[in-house]
Amino acid sequence: MTSLKSDFLRIVTERGYMHQCTDLEALDKRLTEGCQAAYIGFDCTATSLHVGGLMQIMLLRWWQKTGHKPIVLMGGGTTRIGDPTGKDESRKMLTDEVIATNMAGIKTVFTKYLTFGEGKTDALMVNNADWLDKLNYIDFLRDYGHHFTINRMLTFDSVKLRLEREQPLTFLEFNYMLLQGYDFVELFRRNRCILQMGGSDQWGNIINGVELGRRADQAELFGLTSPLLTTSSGAKMGKTVNGAVWLNDDMLSAWEFWQYWRNTEDADVGRFLKLYTELPLDEIARLEKLEGAEINEAKKILANEVTRLCHGDAAALQAAETARQTFEQGVASSDLPTVEIPAAELAAGIPAFALFVRAGLAASNGEARRLLKGGGGKVNDQAVDEAHPVGSNDLRDGAVKLTAGKKRHILVKAV
């Protein structure tokens, strides 16, 4: 959209972040009037965010790079309730101790993408427990309850989904929408925050906050959502057959993170380069045109750039070198994922199919047998019989390298 005047909206539109905006023209005007504050909320349901939340982090990064102040809202209060959005069943209730542990783990990733401090555009991290814990229930209902209608809330997709499936939606979860709306008003009062961003599934919750700000404080607030991404094959972003693709390196190694992006489907390379890297659009356009084997070079660039942002330059370079050694030279790099097996078991010999299952390269004995029979499973880069006993004599530099297909490698070490 060439008519957009603000750098932020122009960038997020050109790169594919934009899904909906409450008032694009008015927001564009506000963003040309100087530094503004925007926030995105993150509930603390695990000790790390995964790739599914990376687009939101990139939105905050672009917000800061274009001269504005990003606010990271940690949901220390709302996580106690659980966001029903996108869920067809109630979330598991978490204790305060678990929430605190999760929050500590999640916080670390933001320092890699944002600059925190006391400056005008420096990022700020806040916890909604700081104000939600102090709310008096009767006062909250009296002051804000009349601004929300059950009629409207029943139209939200997250509510309709539960009701249509005749699945319980607790009053506890129903209150989540009120509290998220109140968060926006509180951040406006404390930090003059005018914009809430989030995934498209949060549209209803964001609208609640925009409308509550207008009714309670006569404030002009805005909402902007990004699309919920799937891969070209329909898979959810951040999910693989082996589980979530975590952003914290204590949950997933930089090598495995790099591999996830290296294995991007051809049709997704250009889109992911726009969303998850800061490469110029003309360079991305060049990479998008690559075909055949050349597209693999674009995938390596994607993997390098995303890993660099998330784990640092050194980790990205090391992951790329591990890939080169593993795939181009056949060397079993020590940076490959590792599984430890008791030395006594390995000395006695473990059938290859059983070892593949224990290493997580196959979900069942049957799957492992088929993999090995078809030649897709290898031990130290050699095809073996499914019942071949893998033992101490197979150790190479203290490890046995298992391979499933062309891209999955595990080192088995005796302990």
UniProtKB/Swiss-Prot annotation:
For molecular function, the Gene Ontology terms on record are: ATP binding; RNA binding; tyrosine-tRNA ligase activity
What job does this protein perform? Catalyzes the attachment of tyrosine to tRNA(Tyr) in a two-step reaction: tyrosine is first activated by ATP to form Tyr-AMP and then transferred to the acceptor end of tRNA(Tyr).
Biological processes annotated in GO: tyrosyl-tRNA aminoacylation
Instruction: Find motif ('HIGH' region) and give its ranges.
Output: 44-53
Mind naming one GO cellular-component term on file for this protein?
cytosol
Of which family is this protein a member? Belongs to the class-I aminoacyl-tRNA synthetase family. TyrS type 1 subfamily.
This protein's record includes keyword Ribosomal protein:
no
Q: What is this protein's name?
A: Tyrosine--tRNA ligase
Which residues are listed for ATP binding in this entry? K239
Which residues are involved in binding L-tyrosine?
Y39, Y176, Q180
| S4 RNA-binding domain: residues covered | 350-415
Q: What is its EC number?
A: 6.1.1.1
Residue window of motif 'KMSKS' region: 236-240
**Catalysed reaction(s)?**
tRNA(Tyr) + L-tyrosine + ATP = L-tyrosyl-tRNA(Tyr) + AMP + diphosphate + H(+)
Q: Which domain of life is it from?
A: Bacteria
Q: Which InterPro entries does this entry report, sorted A to Z? A: aa-tRNA-synth_Ic, Rossmann-like_a/b/a_fold, S4_RNA-bd_sf, Tyr-tRNA-ligase, Tyr-tRNA-ligase_bac-type, Tyr-tRNA-ligase_bac_1
Q: How does it assemble?
A: Homodimer.
Keyword list (alphabetical) reads: Aminoacyl-tRNA synthetase, ATP-binding, Cytoplasm, Ligase, Nucleotide-binding, Protein biosynthesis, RNA-binding
Q: Where in the cell is it found?
A: Cytoplasm
